[in-house]
Amino acid sequence: MKQRRRLPVVILTCAALAAPEESSAVLQSCSVSATALNFGLYDPLSGSAAQSTGTVTVVCQVSLVGLFVNWTVALSTGSSGNYVARQLQNGPNSMSYNLYTNAARTSVWGDGTSGTSVVSANPFLIVGSNTVNYTVYGSIPAAQDRPAGSYTDTLTVTMTY
């Protein structure tokens, strides 16, 4: 009698472990958005880098049962065309800056080429809306004597899953 009670549990466990991932879950969609970094007033005489943070947000919709999803999030070069030498622009004037994946600001956030990094994840997503936030760490090196004005750059955030 005890074996009959245990047998269904064993069969169900084996069936759940043997089921292919695609049949147990449906990933409906994922989207990515980002907040702007605002470095505030830059003082070229301060002797220290200006730093700021922003957020990249990934939102995935899942129906049925949960699943694991592999993804990467990359950033473009911006107007400079170069990951390790990004430039903020103000008309003909430019100012060096960069974006990083870590608080120490040692890992340039790019597309995974030319010594840059991407952020990646393989989270278990549950039914419904799932949100994952990544911090973007920005830095403008010290001692850049530039004309006053508003310096900007625009980058593209790409999520691959």
For each of these PLM feature ranges, what is it?
Residues A74-G78, N98-N102, G110:
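Predominantly extracellular/luminal cell-surface or secreted proteins
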Residues A85-R105:
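A surface/secretory-pathway sequence property marking extracellular, secreted
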Residues A104-S129:
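Extracellular beta-sheet repeat scaffolds used for adhesion and glycan interaction
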